[in-house]
Amino acid sequence: MEHKLVVVTGVPGVGGTTITQKAMEILKEENINYKMVNFGTAMFEVAQSQNIVEDRDEMRKLDADTQKRIQKMAGRKIAEMVKEQPIVVDTHSTVKTPKGYLAGLPKWVLDELNPNMIVVVETTGDEILMRRMSDETRKRDLETASDIEEHQFMNRCAAMTYGVLTGATVKIVKNKNGLLDEGVEELVSILRY
């Protein structure tokens, strides 16, 4: 039996991973057991199993063809998992690079994953900026609230494109400061069967 495959995305600092983990805890109490898979981790595990890299830092140095092959294999690996249980893929809709925005889920990955739903977690650029500034555990590029808003707009555009290519629905979930529970509840309601 095929289960639901949901992709959850958001800009760094929006709280997508946090909101997803909390939603999954609530669903587990209802005997709805999603497995959360970070796409970057799945790629690393594939590359490591193929003896392409030894540590995660080497991933960035791989040539484009190797990256593409690993992405495709990671997508296939996750697609196999969905036969056993529902899956939430934690990833980025777009990645901001010095040369522009890069699709987080290129067509060859979408072809393998074939998601049912894409969730974009958002809040205001100002809130994300404040979260990033107060998070001393991460080293992030300095951006303005306007830069963050642009990145969120690009995430929305990419998510809709992914929906067009796969037939997946696209849902925007707000994760506003002080209102985490509301965002979690909204995600719980769409992850239920």
UniProtKB/Swiss-Prot annotation:
Listed InterPro entries: Adenylate_kinase_AdkA, P-loop_NTPase
Keywords per UniProt: ATP-binding, Cytoplasm, Kinase, Nucleotide-binding, Transferase
SUPFAM superfamilies documented for this protein: P-loop containing nucleoside triphosphate hydrolases
GO molecular function, one term: ATP binding
Gene: adkA
Name of this protein: Adenylate kinase
Subcellular compartments: Cytoplasm
Gene Ontology CC annotation, any one: cytoplasm
Gene3D superfamilies: P-loop containing nucleotide triphosphate hydrolases
Subunit relationships: Monomer.
Broadest EC class assigned to this enzyme: transferase
Species: Methanococcus aeolicus (strain ATCC BAA-1280 / DSM 17508 / OCM 812 / Nankai-3)
Binding site residues for ATP: G10, V11, P12, G13, V14, G15, G16, T17, T18
This protein's record includes keyword Kinase: yes
Family indicated by similarity: Belongs to the archaeal adenylate kinase family.
Chain segments annotated as coiled-coil in the UniProt record: none
Broad class of where this protein is predominantly found: cytoplasm
Residue ranges crossing the lipid bilayer per the database entry: none
EC number(s) from the headed UniProt entry: 2.7.4.3
